[in-house]
Amino acid sequence: MDELLILPRHSGTLEGTVELPLNKSLANRAQIIAALYPHLTLNTIPEAEDSRFLAQALSSAQRDLYLGAGGTTLRFATAYWATQPNTLKVLSGTDALNSRPIAELVDALNALGADITYEGRDQHPPLRICGASITHSSLAFGTLKSSQFLTALLLIGPALPKGLSLTWESLPSRSYVEMTVAMMKELGFDITLDKNSVTIVPYTAATPREITLERDWSALAFWCEAAALSTSTSLFFPGLQPHSLQGDFKVLDYFEPLGVGHTFTSDGLQLTKNSTLAYGKLVYNLEQCPDLALALITTCFALRQPFEISGLSTLPYKECDRLQALVDLAEELGISVKATDNSLSSISYPEKLAPLGPQSSREDHRLAMSLAPLSMLMPLSMEHPEVVAKSYPDFWKHWDQFS
């Protein structure tokens, strides 16, 4: 794909079938589980770059492992290789990945008995990991910065000789930890999650079984955004069902007041364009599903819908500073907003949104996909659209079928 994508003004009609990618969060958890526990197998790996890089990192005999731009990939691979005695690995990624925080996980693993050091800048990748036999079995945290750090520990917990016991005072994005625990329980692990603690019993061999994966609810958010901005929508998504391990399943509830209807069938989910139901100000807390923030807030911008959305404290630490990206987009559209460390609120909207100049994806897959539906309102151009390959490689192919 060319580095600059031109999106002409969209017709506003969406009708057809979209096969969403497999959820990379579940897939990456499943890869670690399959690597650590031989009776569990994973026969399907998504095409998402994050998942492919993790697969390579888990199977490679090379010392130096390149992990692309995936924060989850780095954190899970770090935990895995830390538990593999008599191995030496150096993990690194893109400049953006090497700038993302990792110290909380490294400190936790080292406290358990791992041997991890920094090759370059302190508290950042590249990481030098000398695989070790983990000897300790308990840790206490204050306020955790990322649920992914905790999830990485949960995945290796059953492989430790004494299991693992963790406590904490505060945990962001708890829904992702709940997803991990539910997945592990479903696969037969003995794990107990309470409000501020989790206990994992050492793994014992069980009946062989294959791990199955769900379609990605977070990817649906961008089609919900498109439906909300469309004049007519009838989209079918095979494989999405009303019961899911993913917290992002709540996307349907968040978009319903913005005119997005849905119906489940035995085969999947039907999205439709309904009358916009919202009145007054939309007030949401997205702490448990921050990956929905870009699509949801961009939709509010486009519809000039008043909103107050909190639970955004992790947005600055994603692939880009997503909170700042939203503030910048609002300014370009002529929208006045108020941002705090944890929230974004609309103050006033112009009578007509200002046209947008060339947009940068900022190396963020979700930012790129959240910008695409704005072409329902105006022509759009975007630099480096190929970044969507991180989680949804076929996004532009799917988008083009409705252009």
Q: Residues of each region from the PLM?
A:
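Short, structured segments at the rim of ligand-binding sites
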Residues: 1-403
